[in-house]
A protein has these predicted regions:
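Flavin-dependent oxidoreductase catalytic core characteristic
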Residues: 1-410
Length: 410
């Protein structure tokens, strides 16, 4: 009864699981769910923010129509929101990858008694749980800021969303500790590779990387594979440098002595995994969608990749993999992509299929009738049922009617 990989014989003898860490499977499942929830909460926040930014108009009136500019048309709003939109798609396909990886492991462990995929599964789920939950927590707050003062109202939905999501960075394992779980695996794979073992497919970049970016060598800035090469090089450099400074230290000592360096390397690896899966999903989708849809998806893939480079540019400039001129070109290309994605922004958040009940936001409802919803909600608020606030008649009115305000002693 309730026996999985361990069992108890009729004579009472306990037979342990063939792999002592097989119990990690349950933790892995929860962490893969957290990656899925990261995508869901990021979709929720960016849907609310983009819909409100489409409705809200402020400053710079059009001379022809007299209408003020939609907030979504400001470059800063686009630079904040559209990369989050792209990242939500990236996290969605990465969560699918994690779940497929988990269920494949479950099938092999039960039917074939094959636990060989467990170390990679544990390391990947640990790192992605940390990477995705950090990014989503920050994205929710970034989305709230693009909505101005209204973003801080309870009616906006950001406050409750952030409050319910923020604990993800610490439960089921503190994120920094989980990054070190990924780092330990990277160190072990690297050391085994030096003895002639072939690393898993997703860690193939450890076998070596070019000293110069294919982007810098003339590849198009919209070549998704060239972008992935840049991510692979960054991960390769940071992991190999961390391995070299760790020398002959045991994994435990290496994580303790070079903790910051290893956490940075683990984040770079996770960024590569997300980018890898986003491109893979894009390629798999290619035969099934129209040319117009494919074009939009390609823009999202490129935007996610280029913004990831731009936001951590120092890590690419550090070893001159990308030079200053190329960094400037990447930034210019990002601004072009923002303009191209702008006409499809509403359709892209609609594609998430999140209903108004789940969004629970006056700012993000699908009908876009923001101000009527705000007015109706305020009218229904208990504090607005009476003309005076609670306590006025009991405390303030007697003093006001007597004129008894007191006299200053100064």
């Amino acid at each position: 009864m309730l026996m999985g990989h361990s069992r108890v014989e009729p004579d009472g003898m306990y037979v342990p699981a063939p792999v002592s860490k097989v119990s990690y499977g349950t933790m892995v499942f929860i962490r893969s769910d957290i990656v899925m929830n990261a995508a869901l909460y990021m979709k929720k926040a960016v849907t609310i923010a983009i819909r409100y930014n489409l409705v809200r108009r402020q400053s710079n009136p059009d001379t022809a129509t007299g209408k003020e500019c939609q907030v979504i048309d400001y470059q800063h709003s686009q630079r904040t929101l559209f990369p989050i939109l792209a990242k939500a798609f990236a996290f969605h396909v990465t969560s699918d990858y994690m779940r497929r990886m988990y269920f494949e492991f479950q099938k092999n462990s039960r039917k074939k008694n094959d636990f060989s995929a467990l170390p990679e599964l544990h390391a990947t789920s640990s790192g992605l749980k940390a990477y995705c939950s950090w990014a989503t927590k920050d994205a929710i707050e970034a989305c709230r800021l693009t909505c101005g003062g209204h973003g801080y109202m309870n009616l906006a939905g950001f406050g409750t969303t952030l409050a319910s999501y923020a604990p993800n960075v610490t439960y089921e394992g503190d994120n920094n500790v989980l990054c070190l779980q990924t780092a330990r695996y990277l160190l072990k794979v690297y050391r085994k590779m030096l003895t002639g073992e072939t690393p898993p497919q997703v860690l193939g970049y450890l076998t070596g990387a070019s000293s110069r970016s294919s982007l810098a060598l003339g590849a198009s800035l919209r070549d998704e594979k060239a972008i992935l090469d840049a991510y692979a090089h960054r991960a390769w450099r940071l992991v190999t440098e961390a391995c070299k400074v760790s020398g002959e230290l045991t994994p435990d000592d290496a994580m303790r002595v070079h903790m910051v360096q290893w956490i940075t390397a683990a984040k770079a690896h996770c960024a590569f995994v997300v980018m890898y899966n986003f491109i893979l999903a894009y390629e798999e989708t290619r035969p099934r969608v129209s040319a117009d849809t494919l074009r939009v998806l390609h823009r999202l893939v490129c935007l996610h990749g280029l913004c990831g480079i731009d936001d951590t540019m120092g890590e690419f400039l550090e070893d001159a993999h990308i030079d200053g001129e190329q960094a400037s070109d990447i930034r210019d290309e990002i601004f072009k992509l923002l303009k191209e994605i702008r006409p499809d922004a509403a359709a892209l958040v609609d594609a998430f299929g999140l209903n108004d009940y789940f969004l629970n936001s006056a700012l993000g409802a699908k009908d876009g009738d923001v101000y009527r919803r705000l007015y109706d909600e305020v009218q229904d608020a208990p504090l607005n049922k009476k003309h005076t606030p609670p306590g006025y008649a009991e405390l303030l009115q007697p003093k006001l009617s007597r004129g008894n305000f007191g006299v200053s002693k100064l």
